[in-house]
């Protein structure tokens, strides 16, 4: 993940001003492969099989995969996501959560950043990345999988789009 070409100027909530580092991997296998992020599509397939996404969540595929990153001084905003489920993977095995912070606040509950952890939650829940300590000189990065339930009624998503 350290070798990726990050772009700054992305915000999780268009109504807010704070931005963070971001990479769009793709909306499907072909886009991920073409852009050089085949590993992201393979990661999703591994998680899908290992954790039984189809049986547990009725999820067969992703809508998009992207990577987000934060450094000290970036203050993330609370937001909700489009889609049915958001899945956040913490890849950094060397992350020192107690000293550096950088977890995720989901519906008022802090989920500490722990390397090789996959967090799955309803996309409509308020959430945000937590700030990174000024004692941290590392990039707090995550891989995010946005997913919809197969054949779901997505009427509730209109509420998100209007607000």
Question: What residue spans do the PLM features occupy?
Answer:
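A composition/secondary-structure signal for short, hydrophobic, low-basic-content segments
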Residues: 16-18, 73-75, 123
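Short Gly/Ser/Thr- and Asp/Glu-enriched loop/turn motifs at secondary-structure junctions
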Residues: 60-64
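Conserved short histidine dyad/triad with adjacent acidic residue
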Residues: 65-82
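A generic structural micro-feature
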Residues: 79-85, 135-139
